Regions:
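Alpha-helical elements of Rossmann-like donor-binding domains used by nucleotide-donor carbohydrate transfer enzymes
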Residues: 14-15, 32, 39, 72, ...
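PLP-dependent enzyme catalytic core of the Aspartate aminotransferase-like
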Residues: 79-80, 91-123
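Beta-hairpin "wing" of winged helix-turn-helix
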Residues: 88
Length: 123
């Protein structure tokens, strides 16, 4: 029996109706993302001027340590490598602290990002 679910919106209701059809693909995609997040976290730990905070999200929050500041690292990555990251200094709770936010993307993009950081580290 089809029963309308009144406590969620129509988009969520539609998703619930088709979830079983795509459940295996969804679970596979989630696992692929988790695997890439774990791999990327290990790669980021190669960077001496970053302290990577644990996450369950689709991004990392990292403390930037000398010789860089969050603002300087953000500027260098954009100017030299066309990579834009979030300097979290504008966040009220992180004001005055050197934190950045890094999106987790695909393996190729993530490796390019790490290579850029390694280049900055080795200069």
């Amino acid at each position: 029996k089809d029963v309308s679910i009144w406590n969620i919106n129509s988009f969520a209701e539609f998703f619930m109706q088709i979830y079983n059809k795509y459940q295996a693909q969804y679970e596979k995609a989630c696992q692929q993302f988790i695997d890439e997040r774990n791999r990327f976290a290990l790669r980021l730990k190669e960077i001496h001027f970053l302290r990577v905070l644990p996450t369950q999200a689709n991004y990392f929050c990292c403390e930037v340590k000398p010789p860089y500041t969050a603002a300087e690292l953000t500027k260098q990555l954009l100017a030299r490598f066309d990579i834009m990251i979030k300097d979290c200094n504008s966040k009220t709770s992180l004001k005055g602290l050197n934190y950045i936010r890094i999106s987790i993307r695909n393996q190729v993009d993530n490796d390019y990002f790490v290579a850029a950081l390694l280049s900055l580290q080795n200069q």
